[in-house]
């Protein structure tokens, strides 16, 4: 019996082949299959955000002005979260809440779920775009893997956290000052800065900034012109065709500075990838924990001693008092629908007061 080996060839192109040829064609802006997800979602997310910050009020959901039309500026305008009474409703335009009424849909906070969901899928589409292009030009997919960090943070903060709470109301609104308010909320209600996952996130982001600055400066310092040795000052020519730098010189320099240095470029650049991505993933995990109201460090012994001894106070106990103040002063303003009233005598005061 004879077995013929070979590639199967089609006589004519089907619809998939035709679409594949058009989507993956070499053009100024690559589209690709990922573009079918990325471009519509990014368009709707950005369009919804610009529409909301320009025209839509938050009076019906938060009792706030939040649009340029009402007098806000770029820092104070926002697309606000839906009302707390709407819980985790997707707030579809044709759903039972808005019933196809676009004005009412905007008043209820429908633009927030619209922007959040399209934004999440737009980010996923951008990561798939990096996968697709990397595969097309036969690169490793580390760019896409790195971009999973920002996606994890976005999904955990804007989607998973409010899903663990009573509704979308407790997610961040899409605006600069609104994000600042959310950060204060996280600190007051979750003591977020003392959370080890937040600490790892800060170490990752600031460590990555330090590594980036050191790496950029070192490469600039050790650039040399081909054929003229590694004299970094005399030989540097910004018009040379190809930028090159001396790893040997850089290694010698940092060995003298710190006593240790990266010995090869692969380990160096992997470390620069690992630090920020791991930090972002750890902070995302921490936010998932907060969604479930998990607590981090509680130094109860210090709190008890501070309550018993007016002269004993630590930075931790001071921060706990500050958090109580945030909760007491913020809750009434942040959740007006609850009609919270705190008498003066229950508002926290430090030992010095």
Swiss-Prot record:
Question: Where found, per UniProt?
Answer: Plastid, Chloroplast thylakoid membrane
What this protein catalyses is: 2 a plastoquinone + 4 hnu + 2 H2O = 2 a plastoquinol + O2
Q: Please tell me where pheophytin a binds in this chain.
A: 130, 143
Q: How does it sit in the membrane?
A: Multi-pass membrane protein
PROSITE patterns, from UniProt?
REACTION_CENTER
The molecular function terms in GO held by this entry are: chlorophyll binding; electron transporter, transferring electrons within the cyclic electron transport pathway of photosynthesis activity; iron ion binding; oxygen evolving activity
Residues that bear N-acetylthreonine:
2
EC number in record: 1.10.3.9
Q: Which GO terms describe its cellular component?
A: chloroplast thylakoid membrane; photosystem II
One of the protein's GO biological processes = photosynthetic electron transport in photosystem II
Q: Which CDD domains match?
A: Photosystem-II_D2 (cd09288)
Q: Which PANTHER family match?
A: PHOTOSYSTEM II D2 PROTEIN, PHOTOSYSTEM II PROTEIN D1
Assembly information from the UniProt record: PSII is composed of 1 copy each of membrane proteins PsbA, PsbB, PsbC, PsbD, PsbE, PsbF, PsbH, PsbI, PsbJ, PsbK, PsbL, PsbM, PsbT, PsbX, PsbY, PsbZ, Psb30/Ycf12, at least 3 peripheral proteins of the oxygen-evolving complex and a large number of cofactors. It forms dimeric complexes.
Q: What else is known?
A: 2 of the reaction center chlorophylls (ChlD1 and ChlD2) are entirely coordinated by water.
Family the entry assigns: Belongs to the reaction center PufL/M/PsbA/D family.
What this protein is called in its record is Photosystem II D2 protein
Ranked from the top, the taxonomy reads: Eukaryota, Viridiplantae, Streptophyta, Embryophyta, Tracheophyta
- Gene name, please? psbD
